Amino acid sequence: MELSVVGGEPLLAVAMQQLLDLDLPDELERQLNPPTRAYVRDRRAMANTPMDVKELRASGALVLAVDMPGVAPADVRVEVEDGNVLAISGERRRPAGDGDDGGEGVKYLRMERRMGKFMRRFPLPESADLDGVRAEYKDGVLTVTVDKKPPPEPKKPRVVEVKVAGAGEPKGKGK
């Protein structure tokens, strides 16, 4: 039972195809208010920054490896914020003269590599040595190493000297 036919195809099939042709995420994003758009943008920036986290068995140090192909080391920032949160942020930029500016530059036919700001936050354990955080950038991978604090030495019992009342005081001098 078909309701009507458009160009030889059932109306329902035409409507379904039109829905599939829409780029819904972009259409929905355009209708969001600016603070919500900023939130969506930041969540995408976090989701599009892949990171591996591993713990070294010998030392207990944490090693975070973040893929950052095409990012200049000067555009990367690593900081410890809000106590024990490691924040990695930066920006991936298009090469100079490679913009789609309508001039003599470049006209992109397909853009699949994401450009723009990126950010990742990682909560560090209480045992992390925040003064010993190191970062190294090589071959498009940022490696951040966070050493583990040595365990605190067990408290030794403190010996308290016991004084004997009245011993060593001359007799006859009372209070």
UniProtKB/Swiss-Prot annotation:
One of its GO terms (cellular component) is cytoplasm. Residues 146-161 have a biased composition (Basic and acidic residues). GO terms for biological process: protein complex oligomerization; protein folding; response to heat; response to hydrogen peroxide; response to salt stress. One of its GO terms (molecular function) is unfolded protein binding. Residues 42-165 form the sHSP domain. Keywords: Cytoplasm, Stress response. It is found in: Cytoplasm. Residues 145-175 are annotated as: Disordered. Pfam families: HSP20. Belongs to the small heat shock protein (HSP20) family. May form oligomeric structures. This is 19.0 kDa class II heat shock protein. It comes from Oryza sativa subsp. japonica. The gene is HSP19.0.
